[in-house]
From Swiss-Prot:
Residues 22-50, 150-222, 1450-1512 are annotated as: Disordered. Disulfide bonds: none annotated. Its main location: cytoplasm. Residues 156-169, 1467-1493 have a biased composition (Acidic residues). Residues 190-222 have a biased composition (Low complexity). Signal peptide: none annotated. The lineage of its organism: Eukaryota, Fungi, Dikarya, Ascomycota, Saccharomycotina. Sterol glycosyltransferase responsible for the glycosylation of ergosterol to form ergosterol-glucoside. It comes from Candida albicans (strain SC5314 / ATCC MYA-2876). This is Sterol 3-beta-glucosyltransferase. Residues 359-520 form the PH domain. GO terms for molecular function: sterol 3-beta-glucosyltransferase activity; UDP-glycosyltransferase activity. It is a peripheral membrane protein. It catalyses: a sterol + UDP-alpha-D-glucose = a sterol 3-beta-D-glucoside + UDP + H(+); ergosterol + UDP-alpha-D-glucose = ergosteryl 3-beta-D-glucoside + UDP + H(+).
Amino acid sequence: MSFYKKVTRGLATPLQGSINLFSGSPNVSGDEGTDADNENPEHRTTYHSLSGRVNHDDDDEDVAKLEDIVGFFTGLLNTTTVCAGLGSLNNLKKHYLDEFIKKSALNPLRPQNYGPETSSKLNNNSIEELLNNGDTSLEKVRKMSLYDFDEHTSDSEEEDSADKEEESIAENLKPGKSGKARNHPRDSRTTATLITTQITRTKTATTATPTPTPTSSVDTDVTDVTEPIGKVTTKIPEEQLQGLNPLQKSVVKNLDPHHVREGVLIKVKNSETPLKNDRQELLEKIQLRLKIADKLQRVFDLSDEDTFCGNYSAWLIKDVLLQGHVYLTKDALLYFAFLPKRFSLENSSEVLDEDNSSSIVYSGNLGLKSAKYGEVVLNTVLQHRYWAVLRAETLSIYSSSTNLYFPVLVIDIKKCLYTEIIDKEKLNREAISPVNRGTYSPNGGLSGTATPRASTLENTASELNSMLSGDSYSPTEDNVETTASTVWFKLVTKKKTYKFSCDSSFSARQWCNNITKLIFQHNNANSNGEVLIKIPISKIAEYNKRALFSEEEEEDRTLDVTMNDIPLNVTIKYLGDNDNERKRDKLKRKYKGEEPTIEEVHFLFPKSGVEFFETFDKLVNPVVSDNDNQSSKSSITSTNFSEKAISTLSKSPNHLVQTVLDFNKPVDDDISAFKKFGTTITSPTRIFKATITSPEMTSIDETSLRDSFDSDRLHLPRDMSERALKNLEVSFVTSLKKLEDASKRYEKPHMEHSQTNLASILSDPSEVKKESKTAISKSIKALYSVGTHWSATPNHYFELGKYYVNKVQDRDSSQRNFQSHFSTNSKLLASYYGHLLRTVPVYGKIYVSETDVCFRSLLPGVSTKMVLPMTDIEEVRASRGSRLTYHGLRLIVRGSEELDLEFGSSKSRDDFQKVVLSVLERLHSKEGFRPEPYQWGSNFEVELYKTRMEYSDSENREIQQYDNSIDIKFAEKKIEMARVRMFEDRLMAASGLDVPIILEDSPFFKTELRPSTSYNITLLTIGSRGDVQPYIALGKGLVKEGHNVTIATHAEFGDWIKTFGLGFKEIAGDPAELMSFMVTHNSMSVGFLKNAQQKFRSWISKLLTTSWEACQGSDILIESPSAMSGIHIAEALGIPYFRAFTMPWTRTRAYPHAFFVPEQKKGGSYNYLTHVLFENIFWKGISGQVNKWRVEELDLPKTNLYRLQQTRVPFLYNVSPAILPPSVDFPDWIKVTGYWFLDEGSGDYKPPEELVQFMKKASRDKKKIVYIGFGSIVVKDAKSLTKAVVSAVRRADVRCILNKGWSDRLDNKDKNEIEIELPPEIYNSGTIPHDWLFPRIDAAVHHGGSGTTGATMRAGIPTIIKPFFGDQFFYATRIEDLGAGIALKKLTAKTLGDALVKATHDLKIIDKAKRVSQQIKHEHGVLSAIESIYSELEYSRNLILIKDIHNQNYKRHHPVPSGVQTPAYDTDSDDYDDDEDDDESDKDDEEEEEENSYDGYDGNGVNNSPSQNSSN
């Protein structure tokens, strides 16, 4: 502990009484007061989650204890720390402290004359002499161990840090002295490390002249300080260093690439393969470091005589926050970062036969003010919805999620400059979601222990005020974005600006962040995906450091300045070498005598920032001139340095840094006065601000930078602190990689720094010249040359015969044009002219590349484009043309209808076919391709028999498993990206900055973002076994993520759920009774509503109560909307809420509601109406009971359909996008994840021997095997159904595996017996795992449940569906529309028999089922659902906060009179339903929604809603 800390710490208690008297406050006992303060929870960093868990505890001493004492020390130290323990004393405060010590008897104990030649140790003799004089104050000092007399200087981190702090304070008047070695006392320069002001080469007149330091001593100092504090340096034998140059020796000695330190958010995960300290391990380390030294020298052009000083983890702050490393050498500062593969360019020639989703960075719905009419795209006034797909190099806009071959618009990311949200004021009004569940619970209680209704409105308001960054207004619903209005963002390219709309600011930020990351990668990295910066020490003009945390919570801080825990921002300005600058501009600057370009970079050091800055300061300061300001500055600008700066960074708007600069600018009084009138006044600087129209971006104004950073702390829109970071509940988990992996990465060839600029980014002069032509001239030329092109010969761009284009210039021009038209890096092979047959034939140019077949219209006003991946082409065959002189060709596309092309000559058609087939042959050369039986045509039966005989022995049979390792890898990568998005959302809420984050793909360690605490997740559902099974699969996936999962459902499934290691809680209801009722009423009708109200009223009341009890202690709630209670429970607990279901439940024009499926399609308006109608009918039936339950048990006000905002709740559809493609009118928070399969037969399952023999005999008899089972359906006449099934099987001459579950429920008489005797063609198997059975059979007949439908489609077998109720009708229609099965409206022996024959022999149905199966096998629904939960978590939390604000305001203006008992309500009466009153205000509510207001509350929290007043 430092001298000054011990002085103030020791004197606090004895002087407290006098200090209190001095300040006029009553005297309190020192010891008791101190202990009381320490035990006060408000003064500790310990906080609790909603479930009562302790996340962090701080047992360290409170180094800021003096701040609790008022009076003298309060005035003395009122601004001692600038940001929660990150600053240091300024000159004035140190002066006061020095004067106080001089006047006291402590002055002789103060360390004197710190310097290179003197020791910092106290003289024990002098202390004993003072004690002998009887000085009681010194005796007190001795007792409290003011100074450790027996301590010795060592390399330990604590002692070294304490010494540094002592000497920094004691030597505040000697800023220029240079320190010696690490084991000796160091001085601290006032301009850099002491008071953290700007350090420039321009020394002020008041700064003391530094002591001249010999050049030889600089090297000694550098060598001594290179070993970072706390690092364990490997001792390298001298024989291993022989023959190495100085740079290599210093790298081997000082580089520790695997060194990682824990911090506030950084957690180090123990490596599974720890490093061994044997000789072999040592040799591997040396070899790795030599490889690193070789690469550093080659890439950064380092000298052999340079000296490596140390490496540090640092984040580059530009348009993104990029994780990387800073390497310090004697002559330069180096920054190096490996971009992740997701954001790095891949070799386009490497074509992978895998799902296209692997190359997708992000996808979703976007609004665009343009419409497609036929083949023409026109700008419109109205907004139209499109499906957008963001890939590594393109943003493609499609008319729907199923039509991905014909983009409406393709934007090349390489030509984009930046993207940003247009209405930024809307972001400032956005609600701040409470991340820390214990500290910022909306209701102030612990959801895990009790109903959180204890807090008052004042407490909630104070919490929300603290989260709203000190805004003067109170948090009401007018201040909070309800996400109802559209949010627009713009994408600025070199030639045009595009504007897109999103449904919420969360979605808009996600689009902007993902696009910004891609733009950063394309413009700021070399072709190897590496970001490089080299700043020569001799060219550094200015540097400074600033702390990141606020000083509001200094008393709660646990960070130790001496332990290098301080997150620091370091800004460096240097003289740049712009290689991209034109020679003409350079000459102009030279003749005008202008100064060189000043570049600047910003780094964030989460750890070891102080250590880095001290080392960096020692490297820079010796080269500072001793002359005055002007001479020093001129000498810098006029000197020609031999060292050259290197950077892959390009100029950009740098919105992230500019936002911080703008916020740190001093606010004038006039501007403050304007701000009081509101936020609609436009700033004059914004009016006259120049628009950026070229990649030559203007750099950040230097004067504004200097004015902004006069303080030693970086001010953010919302002050950050250590506690705020911990409240994010996210950690950067770092795990070390193997040495072998790092060595392999460094063995790969790397480009030199002169090759860092990508050739694909540079524009071609000829291309620019061509683009200057007007659209009219292009159209005239296109029409004029149609005849010539129609009869033109093919063009080949590879050496393959007579059509080869010989001129290099023509080949290069065609290649550039092709890449420009389709925004691809693929290599062009051939081009042709022809027609694409759409609604009408479209004339254009056809391209064949290594990866795609492309088409571009050449007709004026027609913008048709086609990009068809080669991997989707299954067959190319000639066909007849539509006219006599035309020559047709047909492309058979996987999973889609056929595409027809027409050519003007047979030679063009034949050459196209030949080239495409050659590409397909090369593409599939490594595959062991064997046609499926359905692909053999007339030989189908023979091939089917051969296949069955190969796999007839089920004990030895191994079903060919699809290798999904690549798909799982990409799905896990998407989960990692979703965690990053969750952290970005939380960081935005905490700091007010939208910070895109890129994690480095380091060869030394892996970093991933993970929640720092395990969430208690409750899955609430009702229904049959098929309704519960998907939730078990999801629960298993969430448990692997580290969370605690509980399924709340009927008692019947409790034991089954527990076998999977999941928690279980019981809710009311009998699934058998419910299904019996649903089968009786297979559609929505008046009788259904009447009978449901009479039969299930008491059950609904019990369901609501038991559901509320089962969800206690939850942190996240995921519910099937059929359970009815989840949205209200989440509102009461203040926790994020998701819905998950298997059937369409969201308003859309694409699909009707599952309960209103028409016999024939009736269009989008009817589909949308069915959803609105069902929502109102469903709510009308349960609203009375629900509102009574809300008031009496949940302590929530009544609600209505509008206030529930069900359409804004995040929704997860556990259905494959192949079966339920996401509609373009789905909001951003609606996700179609894929099926949640629970593979019960993939483990040690052993089928019954009778079943195995039955299947063997069917194969020998060459009979098809079908499965018939209707799950847990309850029917009236089970015997008649069984007879019809038996007759149909005999009629179709197939073998049947029967699961006769329809007679095993409720009908106790027939439960254990068979109604009729089954023939030998039928085997009654009972329940068999679908994932084991379905791949071994030919067709399946079932009821159309979502799970069973998914299992049959994944197996790729034709499906016959006989629906009974609910979503079964919807899936029967969908399967029939896809052509993969048959829907039975009526089940008889004849209809079922005919369907069995068609399903087992129709090759079109068989083929379509196989194609759907191939798509589903690429999906991983559980992983996609986890990704969606992470990505939408903060959006969901925000919705709950909005509702909580409404509820608190409602209670404030509608208090319950004291002493008045709540009246009892009759449960059989509907008088409690306030829908009639609420419906009267729905029109007003909708108008308020348009104005981005919510539920009738004005800005002052006053209720103006007529529905609220009338209902009470």
